Structures are given as C-alpha cells and as structure tokens.
C-alpha cells in the first residue's frame, strides 16, 4: 500500500512537472520570454525602466493592474506593464502602417506568482520581427531582429539580476 501511495505521488509530481514544462514551452512558442527576478516587483520595475533609459530609449507609461483592481475592491498580485520604446526607430514603421500602433511600443510585464516569486515577461525580438511586423504588412531585416532581441535580453538581464 505504501509503495502504491509513493508511486501515485511520483506520478502526480511528474504530471505537474510536465504541465509546467508544457506551459513554458507554449509561452516560448508564442514568442514570450520570461525571466525570474532576484528583486521585488517594485525594484524590478525600477531597474527595468532605468535600463531602458540608459540605452537612450523612453519609458512611455506603466499600467499597474493590481492598483486598478484595488480601486474596485479586488486583490491582485503585482502585474505591471511597462510601455517603452525609441520614437526615432518606431515612428517610421507606424507611419507606414497605422495599425502597428496597436502592438507598438514594446511592452514588458513585471509580475508576481502565487509563491511570491517575481518574473519579467516580454515579447522576443524574433516574435516582434517575424510575427508582429508582418501582421501589419511590414518586414524587419534579420539583423534588426537580432539586434532587437539582444537589446531586450540586455534590458531584462539588467532588471532581473
């Protein structure tokens, strides 16, 4: 009986592991990059915004979903979206395709899970270049996709490490 219980427990752990792995895989396939942060949510947001500014880019705004939920009497763990970009780079594509403005500027999400762990999630450069831009009839040269991906990685690393 004890062996049966151990086997059931092991099977349950394996199933949970597979579900988590599948969820992470789906997120990666959908162009999302998620990095764990070594800092509380508020500090991760501040570090991300400082990293954006250090690259000469602009932080346009924050959307604090937890604060909005609180205003209507609901509780939510931290969920803050940061809109950031570089008008020198982003304006021309939006002039060519007005609908790009629904997806631009890029966004980062700082969020806390049920265990209190903080994460930073953003669209990969590859996703932006191969999915977002073509969705609006635009193309992004492979070198620009690569450079954007590296920039986003650098920003995320500066915020989370």
Q: Could you say what each language-model-derived stretch is?
A:
Residues 21-27:
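Sec/Tat signal peptide C-region and signal peptidase I cleavage site
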Residues 126-161:
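C-terminal partner/receptor-binding element of secreted or periplasmic proteins
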Residues 108-138:
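Beta-strand/loop substructures that line and gate deep hydrophobic ligand-binding cavities in soluble
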Residues 27-58, 157-161:
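Terminal, regulation- and interaction-focused segments at domain boundaries
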Residues 1-5:
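N-terminal secretory signal peptides that target proteins for export/translocation
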Residues 49, 53, 57-60, 64-106, ...:
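Compact, glycine-rich, soluble single-domain proteins
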Residues 42-45, 49, 66, 145, ...:
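Extracytoplasmic/secreted envelope proteins and their assembly/folding machinery
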Residues 9-21:
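Bacterial N-terminal signal peptides
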